[in-house]
Each structure stands twice: as C-alpha cells, then as structure tokens.
Amino acid sequence: MKQTKYIFVTGGVLSSLGKGIAAASIATLLKNSGLKASILKADPYINVDPGTMSPFEHGEVFVTDDGAETDLDLGHYERFLDESLSQDNNFTTGRVYQSVIEKERRGEYLGKTIQVIPHIVGEIKDRIKKAGEGKDILIVEIGGTVGDIEGLPFLEAIRALRLEVGKNNAMNIHLTLVPFIKAAGELKTKPTQHSVGELRRIGISPDMIICRSEKALDRDLKDKIAISCGVEKNCVIESVDAASIYQIPLNFLKQDILNPIAEILDLKNLKPNMENWDSLVKRVIAPSNEVKIAFVGKYVDLKESYKSLTEAIIHAGAALDTKVELKWVDSEKLENMESAEVFKDVSGILVAGGFGYRGVEGKIKAIQYARENKIPFLGICLGMQLALVEFARNVLKLKDANSSEFDEKCENPVVYLIDEFMDTNGEKQIRTAKTPLGGTMRLGAYKCDIKEKSLLAKVYNEAKSVKERHRHRYEANPKYRVDFEKHGLIVSGESKGLIEAVELNCHPFFLAVQFHPEFTSRLEHVNPVICGFIKAAINYEDN
C-alpha cells in the first residue's frame, strides 16, 4: 500500500494566527495539483468535542455529514478543499483519553500500566494514520501554541510519526508571528526565533516557516529568519494580512511554496490550476454590485460564532458579483428598539440559529417586520422555529404560542421536543429534557423531501430532495400544520414526517429552514438557499 505523506502544521508565539487558513490553503494548492489531499485538526483541549462549549468561548461548532461536532477550522477545510470531511478529521485530548480509558476498562491493554507514552501518544498516531488512509497527502494541524503543556503529547506523536514514516514522507511547517513595532518602525524576528527554539527543545525542527505579519518581509529579513531558524531560504514564506482569506492560496503560490514542499516530500512537479479560484477571489474583493442585509443574532459580539454563515454569504456574493454588507443586529437589544428604524436601510433580513431564551423576542420582532413589510427573509434553525412562533401569535392569534424550549408549560407549543428520532446511521435515539447535552442533538446530514413548485424547489433548481446538515434538539410541532397552511405558511420541506422548511406563498421571498445550509456552502459551489436569499435581496434593492 502506498505510504501517505504528512505535513504537520504547528503554531508559535500566540494563538489565532491562522494555522487553519494556512493549512487549508496548502491543501487547496496540493489538491488542484492533482493529489488526493485531506486535512486533520488535532485539538489539545480536554473537552470531548466543542458541542457543549459556549460560542463566546470557542466560536462556531461546525457539523460534518456524519454528525460530528467539530472545530470551526473544519469548516475552512471543507470550504477550501470543496470536499466533505468526517469525524475522522478532528479529535481532541478528551476524545483520545476517553478512547484509551474505554480500552483499558475492556482489558485491551492486558493489565499494563497506562501511560502518556506509549498509550496516549500511540492513540494520537493511530488517529492521524486513519485520517490519512487512501490519501496521497494529509495535512495535520496541531491546535494551540508550541509551549502549551496540553499540546506536548501531540507534538511527541508527530515527532515519532515522522521518524516512523521516513524523511521523504513527512515535513514540519511552523507558523509564527513577525510583529511590526510601530514605535521602531520595523518588523521583529525575535519571537519567531524563540518559538522555533521551543519547538526544537521538543525534538522537532521545522522544514518551513510561515511568517504572519501585517507588513511584507523583505529579502534580508527572510534570509535572517532562514539562518537563525535553520531552514532553506526558499522555505521562509510570508503570510501578510489580505483582503480575503481566499487570497491566501494565491499569495502562497506567488511565493512558490510548492517547490520546497515537492522537494522535501519527493513529489512530482506541482502545478495547480487555480484559474476559477482566482476569478472568484477577484469578485470577492472587487464586486460590481452591493446589497445590505440585516444579520439578526444573539452572538453578534463574536462574529466567529457565525463563521460558516458569514462565509456562505461571501460565496453567494462572489457567485452574484455582489458585495453583501452585513448590518449586525443584536437580537437582545432589538427587543427595546423600533423595528422600522433598525431595518429601514436593508434589503433582506436573516435570522440565525442559537440556543436559549435570551434575545428570542427580538428575533420574533425581526421576523414579523420582514413578513409584514415583504422584505426578503431567511430563517435558519431557531430562525425557522421562531418564524412558526411569530406566525402562530400574530396570524393564528395564539398569543401564548411558544417553543417548549422556552416555556415547558406552554399551551400552544408550536415547537416541541421529540422523544425519538433516527440518527444518520439509522439507529433510534431517545432524548428527554434531562438527557445530557453532549452529542444528543439531531446531528449531521438528513434527506429533505421538497414540495413541488415551491420556493424551496425553485431555489434547489426543482430538485425533489436534498441532503443538508442539522444541529438542533427541538422540532416543529406537526399538530399545527393544517392551521399554518390554511393561513398561507406552507410546509415545503419534510424529512420522515419532520418539518424541514416553511415558506409564505404571498411574499417575494420568505423561507425558513430547520437545517443549516451554510455548512455545505463552498466558494466554488455556493449553497442554493443562501444564494437564493441574496439574489432576492438584490432584486428587492433594484425594485
């Protein structure tokens, strides 16, 4: 069997430098060179997965087709690679320890003392190898920063794995910060030197340095970094702040990043075809048109909470040659504001998902304003559920209508908790209000059957069904379906009896979906729901 080659990506100095974007950019170039490339994110935190972490703590939880709740970097990987990944492409310290402890309880270690080396490190290596099966090359991003105590087992694993597979089958790329000191008017390399020194103490010598900086590095500075860090001069790559993250692969390509990679890994001459990508990036950076939409959410102070959705909107804008300006609206603050004043200058209203009661009434106000004023509207996940609540209260006149998530004693629960459902593996899952939160939602891709001649059908180019990803615990209550449809709110999408999409039949564009269309949107293949909504907003603006 052909040996998979590995590129290990580590980060130094501080976090949030963009290791995920750098890794995804390199993977994109390799894939477009004809290689079967994939990416793995290894997170050193002890949570089993990010599913129960606060959006303010971790940002978005990205969901894969097979229902894994993963790091938001997996979203970047999918959007850059234009491929669907799985639970094998992300794991945490918590997941590793959970697996090792379960094996110990089953007696698989035959009574041995369980230790970080070899057992924890061995589990990490096994998971890396599994993710690389059937691939020409696997890029492994190690979360956190070199020097973090929780990252040591991961660094030991990649050190050992490189020795195991041989020098032409693995390389290390270290991404570090080269800060610009305004008072001195110069870039400083000392943090990079210290970071590489820390990495070497662990037993890893980088083959390539990627330098994050707000200003370009001149040749002398690159040579200084190469000499002090012990890498070839053509292996110092700059990653300067860009107008769009989708520029990064093109910026890397201009610096011939693939030449040293091909040399180190003994690969054929790599010449990626990036023409279509380049064309789309130009439309992202300098589009011909502009439209403004309101983005109504409860986590608007941390935009990373909606990373896939904001990226999907960028994809739609590129496809339509339009800059989409987002007007961020805090749903909690909206409760005490005048809707007409807030939405007077927008051509569309998007109500995003979320959990918990805070800000719910503000979202309902936004939905009511979009419905009554015939402004293009898209509701996602909780946004669909609240569209049902708003319609029930203001059209069906069920003033106490609510979701049982927010009022368990509600007499008209138009949204409720179902006790049983089939997961993506076809297995029955049972949940109650007291079920543990971790991993108990309806997660992953499910088939949605589409009503003929509906807005949803038009958006999906008359497809009879689609598969989209979910992450929710509560469902639309079918008890109210007849009354909803009698008054014009049509169910246009279903999944084995569960309501997946609703729309208004006397409105230019009023669509609400239970699934998350943003999770399957890519720069080169925008999700039809997002694109349809932005197109409707453009038409509203023009008219």
UniProtKB/Swiss-Prot annotation:
EC no. given is 6.3.4.2
PROSITE patterns (alphabetical): GATASE_TYPE_1
Q: How is its activity regulated?
A: Allosterically activated by GTP, when glutamine is the substrate; GTP has no effect on the reaction when ammonia is the substrate. The allosteric effector GTP functions by stabilizing the protein conformation that binds the tetrahedral intermediate(s) formed during glutamine hydrolysis. Inhibited by the product CTP, via allosteric rather than competitive inhibition.
One GO biological-process annotation of the entry reads: 'de novo' CTP biosynthetic process
Q: What class of enzyme is it?
A: ligase
Annotated catalytic residues: 381 (nucleophile), 516, 518
Keywords from the named record: ATP-binding, Glutamine amidotransferase, Ligase, Magnesium, Metal-binding, Nucleotide-binding, Pyrimidine biosynthesis
Q: One GO molecular function term?
A: metal ion binding
Region of interest: Amidoligase domain: 1-267
Positions binding Mg(2+) in this chain are 73, 141
Residue positions binding L-glutamine: 354, 382-385, 405, 473
Residues at which CTP binds: 15, 148-150, 188-193, 224
The record's note on quaternary structure and interaction partners says: Homotetramer.
Quote the record's miscellaneous comment: CTPSs have evolved a hybrid strategy for distinguishing between UTP and CTP. The overlapping regions of the product feedback inhibitory and substrate sites recognize a common feature in both compounds, the triphosphate moiety. To differentiate isosteric substrate and product pyrimidine rings, an additional pocket far from the expected kinase/ligase catalytic site, specifically recognizes the cytosine and ribose portions of the product inhibitor.
The name this protein goes by in its record: CTP synthase
